[in-house]
Design a protein with these regions (language model features):
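Short coil turns that delineate tetratricopeptide repeat
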Residues: 60, 109, 156, 189-190, ...
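Helix-start (N-cap) detector for alpha-helical repeat units in TPR-like alpha-solenoids
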Residues: 29, 63, 71, 78, ...
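Canonical positions in the second alpha-helix
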Residues: 55, 104, 151, 184-185, ...
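Canonical tetratricopeptide repeat
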Residues: 69, 73-76, 83, 120-123, ...
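Register position in tetratricopeptide repeats
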Residues: 41, 83, 90, 130, ...
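N-terminal leader/linker segments that initiate helical-solenoid repeat arrays
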Residues: 2-4, 20-86, 90-91, 99, ...
Length: 307
């Protein structure tokens, strides 16, 4: 009986020491947590992060008694990681920013903070796009494409990345690649911006065809450009090409919408004359009668047609 009583005393003593150790862990965890909260309020984010991480470790060591404090730490650590990542990005430390965002994603996912994980995931491709934009502004188009492709590796449905890739490829003379990128961007929330870019791509192609005396190519690309939006140059190039092809209905339709100048008026006059509409031809020849280059020819036409 004495031996049994001695065993109980020893057992109770062990429990007291064990419980006391838990209490000490929780007390220290609470103190560290409060210090971390103070650091955070003072803008010392790195000190705050280290403090909350230590408080979490101590709270978990305290077992069930520290469960609530551990939950509090898990709720704030991913958010601090995102905040530090943003600060790194603002300081142009892009690698450091991405590392913090990825750490935030891992912790937030592990601890069930879907909102913070989602925010961090959205920020990573934005970092690559920002870097790409800097290179684009410096006319380092190939290097910029590399950064935009990194953004797509993180977010395959990033319409802005496709839009910027298209802009870079257009500058590099890769019209086919630019068109493919812009068409993809159109399906991913960048329709208006992508259409503006496609207008320019096809106008550029049409102008190159016109200079190369490929009138059919110039007309086709000008019309393709106009499928995406209005452009005065597309009307002028397409109309000029149509005159060369003797497609006078197309010429009149396009040139009537082009910005008026001597060449546009001349080609409209020719087109109406070819269609047998002397009155309209005369109207446009009169508009260029005073032109230094076309005036004498126009005056002769006016004399012949305007009776």
């Amino acid at each position: 009986m004495k031996r049994f009583s001695k065993f109980l005393i020893m057992a109770f003593a062990s429990l007291f020491v064990f419980a006391n150790a838990y209490a000490q862990d929780l007390g220290e965890a609470t103190e560290v947590y409060n210090n971390a909260a103070t650091a955070l309020s003072e803008g010392n984010d790195n000190d705050a992060l280290a403090g909350f991480q230590k408080a979490l470790s101590l709270a978990e060591a305290a077992g069930e008694a520290g469960a609530q404090l551990a939950t509090e730490c898990k709720g704030i650590i991913p958010k601090i990681l995102v905040k530090i990542g943003k600060e790194a990005a603002n300081a142009k430390d892009l690698d450091g920013a991405i590392a913090k965002f990825k750490e935030a994603i891992a912790k937030a996912t592990e601890w069930g903070d879907a909102e913070t994980a989602s925010e961090a995931k959205e920020l990573i491709p934005l970092i690559f796009i920002t870097d790409g934009n800097q290179l684009l502004n410096e006319k380092k188009f190939a290097e910029a494409i590399v950064e935009y492709e990194k953004a797509l590796a993180e977010d395959p449905d990033n319409g802005m990345a496709y839009l910027r890739i298209g802009m870079c490829k257009n500058q590099l003379g890769d019209a086919a690649g630019a068109i493919a990128a812009f068409e993809k961007a159109m399906t991913l929330g960048q329709e208006a911006n992508a259409k503006k870019q496609l207008v320019n791509v096809y106008v550029k192609k049409a102008n190159a065809d016109l200079r190369a005396k490929n009138s059919q190519g110039a007309l086709d690309n000008a019309k393709k450009s106009l499928e995406y939006g209005e452009n005065p140059n597309a009307y002028m190039i397409g109309g000029t090409a149509a005159v060369a092809l003797k497609k006078y209905d197309d010429a009149i339709e396009l040139l009537s919408k082009a910005k008026a100048n001597a060449n546009v008026n001349y080609n409209l006059a020719r087109s109406y004359e070819a269609k047998g509409n002397s009155a309209k031809a005369c109207e446009y020849y009169k508009l260029i009668a005073a032109d230094a280059k076309l005036g004498e020819f126009a005056k002769a036409k006016v004399a012949a047609l305007c009776k």
